[in-house]
Regions:
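Long, low-complexity, intrinsically disordered segments
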Residues: 105-115
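Claisen-condensing/thiolase-fold acyl-transfer catalytic domains that form or cleave C-C bonds
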Residues: 1-101, 112-113
Length: 115
């Protein structure tokens, strides 16, 4: 439900940074979020490479944002979790396409990217 509400299925996903503390979590989350087989998951190494307490979820968001800012991807999913049995989840879709304001043009020098 969180992935659907965040808009995961609203367009192609280039990369997904998933909070997967165990290898089987990737298969579960990939399936439940409906991520295509060609979506690159955890190119950073994810929490299996480093899982700092209380920051691992924010790192997932930062990893996707960084890839959008450097131009390697256009749209990505970041997932964070906490609590027992993964019952507390956050899914964020970050998009590199610049949004237009109601006047039809962007008025900010800040990079777009959150949803």
């Amino acid at each position: 439900l969180a992935a659907e509400a965040a808009g995961v299925g609203d367009g192609p996903i280039d990369v997904a940074e998933l909070h997967t503390c165990f290898t089987h979590h990737e298969a579960i989350l990939r399936n439940e979020m409906g991520l295509a087989d060609d979506v690159v998951v955890n190119p950073s190494g994810g929490p299996l490479a480093a899982n700092p307490m209380m920051a691992a979820g924010m790192i997932r968001i930062g990893e996707v944002a960084n890839r959008i800012f450097d131009g390697t991807v256009n749209r990505g999913v970041a997932h964070a979790t906490g609590g027992h049995l993964m019952q507390h989840n956050l899914v964020a879709v970050l998009d590199g396409e610049q949004s237009a304001t109601s006047e039809g043009s962007s008025t900010s020098d800040e990079p777009e990217g959150g949803r």
